[in-house]
Design a protein with these regions (language model features):
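C-terminal beta-sandwich interaction modules and adjacent acidic
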Residues: 1-120
Length: 120
């Protein structure tokens, strides 16, 4: 059986240089693989597709659990952009096993990243 997970963000909006926090729940990790949370962005549209993991935290290898997390958003972003030719999207993903690839993604939550100072 494949492990199942869910992620709930405290807020779906974060500033460059700020942080995103939330709660992860998982169960069915009978193979005791590492559970992790990553913050990553990806581009879509014309041209090359790009993706990068900018922050990650491991939560352990329990069969089931619930854990709080906090991931730092880079000070220089990039910010979320939704244009006609290009989109830049952010996501928080639960990964079982915990690694920096897209393999093993068990749950995701979308995030909007805005320039520093916009939320004041």
């Amino acid at each position: 059986m494949r492990a199942q997970a869910s992620v709930v963000l405290d807020h779906h909006l974060a500033e460059c240089g700020g942080a995103v926090a939330g709660t992860v729940r998982w169960h069915g990790n009978g193979r005791r693989q590492r559970v992790g949370v990553v913050l990553r962005y990806r581009t879509e549209g014309r041209g090359d597709v790009d993706t990068d993991v900018v922050a990650a935290v491991e939560l352990g290898d329990a069969d089931a659990g619930e854990s709080r997390f906090r991931l730092d958003v880079p000070p220089l972003g990039p910010v979320t952009y939704n244009g006609r030719l290009l989109r830049l999207l952010w996501v928080v993903a639960v990964q079982i096993p915990a690694n920096r690839s897209f393999l093993g993604t068990a749950a995701t939550a979308d995030l909007t990243v805005v320039p520093n100072g916009w939320l004041r």
